Amino acid sequence: MKNLLIIFSLIILTKVSYSQGCVAVRSTGNTCSMDQADLSTKWKLNLNNRYFRSYKHFVGKEEQKHRVDSGTQVINHSYSLDITLTRKLTNRWALGITVPVISNVRSSMYEHYGNTSKNPNARRKTKSFGIGDTRISAYRWLIDPVKSVKGNVQAGLGIKLPTGDFRYQDIFWKTDSTYLMGPVDQSIQLGDGGTGIALELRGYYNLSHQLGLYSDLYYLVNPREQNGVSTARGGTPNANAIKYFTSTMSVPDQYMARVGVNYMVKKLSIAAGARLEGIPSSDLIGGDGGFRRPGYIVSVEPVISYELKKVQLYASVPFALERNRTQSNSDKLITAAT
């Protein structure tokens, strides 16, 4: 690998959340890279770091502020390192593999002693750590990069493999001396248990030598409906969970879109854009049963990057403008029944 381009990227998200303090959106990899048609190297190693903390609760677009005020909010700390190795086959074709390493910590009361408990030990933590779901993709520039130097569009098609442990378990304390061992919450599981199809579309257009536009589109199709993992945290599912199909975890689709403008000054690049990411309540293929937390986040996304010979550094800190915890299929069934 004589010609190896290494990219380090850092994405930090704070105060991002859906209902129950959870963000179920998993890392998509390479979301901080604004690649152009690089003809100088055959290999590229991308190390994409992403961290976020979630603690707010939403019903629709309305924040449930009383959860924070009462101290019963759920707090998630999630970190992922996406390791992506890309091999350029020709000027237009490339192959890539992404392997995420994930570490999660979840703090709550309702999963343990209960939100009404006055015990000072009522808030407990569950954790998960390991390899996430691996993605293998093929990419093609739709326009010959040699002929089109101002702009191009790259399409990607891949397969997402269920290499992450989607049955990860930890301890749920019920009193100071009694506990249950069971699957951790869906938001901190290392994988979803499904084999998916990853669709990507990336484009750029240079308005001048310094000013350019970029866009990224990503959609993960997960045909599997449920993965069979219990949501009862080591206990027995209640009648309503069984009736409304939330006793096991779903395998939902996922999407992400980014658009923006970047300005380059020698080796420094500054970008500003918008970012949309979320989980739909209904999948493109397969059923919609099982427990999921659908919704979306709209953010502004400043990005700064710097190039050091064969190493590129990226950093991004998105700021959420809108959060919407939409109804799942089960939520709709409950609403119709009541």
Which residues fall in each region the model found?
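Repeated loop/turn-to-beta-strand initiation elements of outer-membrane beta-barrel proteins
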Residues: W43, W93-L95, V146-S148, Q210-L213, ...
